[in-house]
């Protein structure tokens, strides 16, 4: 028999199915607007702020806000690797803390190894998947 409190919560919060979709555009640089190219370049520059002594994989993110501001983030590893912070979360948390009511319109992600920037988009970290 189900405890009354649990049964009551199930009836109170009718379960429903929600579907969330995300669209990702993979473009060549010549297909981007000038503003979008600025955001990509900001993401590349943000790689310079990465602290990635363990993975040697620097990730930079730039977010374009609806008011035209750009917020950046980079991955931050620590001695408890791999439980650092990914660049996406750093940028999103910073945007949320500094501009909580301003929507994000665009996210650009750049990844760099010791050989240079990756030629293909990188996958999200394990925490973001």
Question: Where are each of the predicted segments found?
Answer:
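Intrinsic-disorder-associated, low-complexity terminal segments enriched in Asp/Asn/His/Tyr and depleted
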Residues: 6-11
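Short beta-strand scaffold segments in enzyme catalytic cores
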Residues: 56-65
């Amino acid at each position: 028999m189900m405890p009354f409190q649990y049964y009551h919560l199930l009836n109170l919060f009718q379960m429903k199915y929600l579907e969330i979709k995300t669209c990702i555009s993979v473009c060549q640089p010549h297909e981007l607007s000038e503003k979008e190219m600025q955001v990509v370049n900001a993401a590349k520059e943000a790689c310079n702020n990465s602290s990635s002594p363990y993975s040697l994989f620097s990730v930079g993110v730039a977010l374009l806000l609806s008011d035209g501001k750009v917020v950046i983030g980079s991955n931050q590893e620590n001695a408890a690797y791999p439980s650092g912070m990914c660049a996406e979360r750093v940028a999103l948390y910073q945007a949320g803390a500094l501009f909580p009511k301003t929507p994000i319109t665009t996210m650009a992600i750049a990844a760099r190894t010791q050989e240079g920037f990756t030629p293909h988009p990188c996958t999200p970290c394990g925490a973001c998947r």
